[in-house]
Swiss-Prot record:
Keywords: Ribonucleoprotein, Ribosomal protein. GO terms for molecular function: structural constituent of ribosome. It holds the Pfam family Ribosomal_S2. Coiled coil: none annotated. GO terms for biological process: translation. This is Small ribosomal subunit protein uS2. GO terms for cellular component: small ribosomal subunit.
Length: 198
């Protein structure tokens, strides 16, 4: 295994590799193994590589041209924090239909690329992106379909700690790619600061 962005134990502690008991043929290539209880386990090496690739891609965009969406509760705090750190636009919470397709809507926006936390729960954002030819990056678990997703990050997209860690790593890598922090530099906040607090 090549060197990871963080220690393997940190990935494991966040449950980033924990999938579901369902899998799609789209996600099969990202699955490392099946546990005895039928739970699919994602390949952390592939997740790590994909985070690097996507950070490199997103770093080439102006921050205001990136939109990050999270409808589900556990994704909202990480998405907000990601926006604060990177300057990307965010929609945590309900995605109003027409946000990307109705120019008369007061909060209409025209991003050049979109990141969704779950292609199923963020389906409206994915659909509107496809209608406008906007590339879609999605955090995808073992049971997700990739029919409208351009690039998937294979990850547990339901776990509070896992989602926070992915957005923290993406933010850190984007800032490294932009040269905002050194190549081996760190953020001044921890991954736990991206988590939803109760």
């Amino acid at each position: 295994m090549s060197e990871l962005l963080i220690e393997l134990d940190n990935y494991l502690a966040a449950g980033l590799h924990i999938g579901t008991q369902q899998k799609t043929s789209d996600m099969e290539k990202y699955i490392f193994r099946v546990r005895s209880d039928g739970l699919y386990v994602l390949d952390i090496q592939k997740t790590d590589e994909r985070i690097r690739q996507i950070a490199k891609l997103l770093a080439r965009y102006d921050p205001e041209d990136i939109l990050v969406v999270a409808t589900r509760q556990y994704g909202q705090a990480p998405v907000k924090k990601f926006g604060e750190v990177t300057g990307a636009k965010t929609i945590p919470g309900r995605f109003i239909p027409g946000t990307l397709t109705n120019p008369t809507y007061a909060k209409f926006i025209e991003p050049k690329i979109i990141v969704v936390t779950d292609p199923r729960s963020d389906a409206q954002a994915v659909l509107e992106s496809k209608q406008n030819g906007i590339p879609v990056i999605a955090l995808c678990d073992t049971e997700n379909l990739l029919s409208f997703v351009d690039i998937a990050i294979p990850v547990n997209n339901k776990g509070r700690k896992a989602i926070a860690l992915v957005y923290w790593l993406l933010a850190r890598q984007i800032l490294r790619e932009r040269g905002t922090i050194p190549e081996d530099g760190d953020l001044d906040i921890e991954a736990t600061d991206f988590e939803l607090k109760f």
